[in-house]
């Protein structure tokens, strides 16, 4: 049987962007959120609902207004040497002097906008971590998705976690161990599944991205949009 971290109510399964009863700083002590800890072989993640519904709704509206997404060539991804349209919208924001390379693209982030700074600062406050870059992914509905991958780019600061903050529709999120992938896996390792609620924070701690791939699969029943912010600590570009 697959492992589960969170079981939301039926409203979440319909993709309406509602979150379960707040379990984190949104309703209690901001600096002491109610974390749910997910542990497996080589996997270390922590989950909480960080923003209550009213605040999460407000942030979602501001993200829809303020974030400028890639178009043209920047809206394509390279897979096995071929270029394909990205099945979601993407944008990058961060500190000056940074670049980030993934899927065949080298990107220079846009300057921070207020809503992204506000979310970043909240995440830093409750985790004690610092982040200088964010990748924004917008999924218009359950047909938009991202395949199995690891966030292991060379620009990432060694030993730094990745903070994933979700707004909008609740979506399934799946971890698969690198040894259990493909038609002839080396061995069987339980898949780890969770559902990322509106206003939630998932901390992916080392060495998770060394051993586990993660994905956001197609879910046609989900009709509402979702915006995900993955905050990272990037090494300055060498000159």
UniProtKB/Swiss-Prot annotation:
Entry binding sites for Fe cation: 149, 151, 214
Binding site residues for substrate: 80-82, 100-102, 152
Protein name per the record: DNA oxidative demethylase ALKBH2
GO biological process: DNA alkylation repair
Knockout-associated phenotype: No visible phenotype, and no effect on the level of 1-ethenoadenine in genomic DNA in aging mice. In contrast, the levels of 1-methyladenine in genomic DNA increase over time in aging adults.
Compartments where located: Nucleus; Nucleus, Nucleolus; Nucleus, Nucleoplasm
Quaternary structure and interacting proteins, as annotated: Interacts with PCNA homotrimer; this interaction is enhanced during the S-phase of the cell cycle. Interacts with nucleolar proteins NCL, UBTF and NPM1. Interacts with XRCC5-XRCC6 heterodimer.
Co-factor binding comment: Binds 1 Fe(2+) ion per subunit.
Region (Disordered): 11-32
């Amino acid at each position: 049987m697959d492992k589960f971290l969170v079981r939301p109510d039926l409203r979440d399964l319909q993709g309406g962007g509602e979150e379960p009863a707040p379990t984190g700083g949104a309703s209690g002590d901001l600096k002491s959120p109610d974390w749910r800890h997910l542990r497996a072989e080589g996997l270390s993640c922590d989950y909480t609902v960080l923003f209550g519904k009213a605040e999460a709704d407000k942030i979602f509206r501001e993200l829809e207004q303020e974030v400028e997404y890639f178009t043209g060539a920047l809206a394509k991804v390279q897979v096995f040497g071929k270029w394909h349209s990205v099945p979601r919208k993407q944008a990058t924001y961060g500190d000056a002097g940074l670049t980030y390379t993934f899927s065949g693209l080298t990107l220079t982030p846009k300057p921070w906008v207020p809503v992204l700074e506000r979310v970043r600062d909240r995440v830093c406050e409750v985790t004690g971590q610092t982040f200088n870059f964010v990748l924004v992914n917008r999924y218009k509905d359950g047909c938009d998705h991202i395949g199995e991958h690891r966030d292991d780019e060379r620009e990432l600061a060694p030993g730094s976690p990745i903070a994933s903050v979700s707004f909008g529709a609740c979506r399934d999120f799946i971890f698969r161990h690198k040894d259990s992938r493909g038609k002839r896996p080396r061995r069987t390792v339980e898949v780890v599944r969770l559902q990322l609620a509106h206003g939630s924070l998932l901390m992916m701690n080392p060495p998770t991205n060394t051993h586990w791939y993660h994905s956001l699969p197609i879910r046609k029943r989900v009709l509402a949009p979702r915006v995900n912010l993955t905050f990272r600590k990037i090494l300055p570009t060498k000159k």
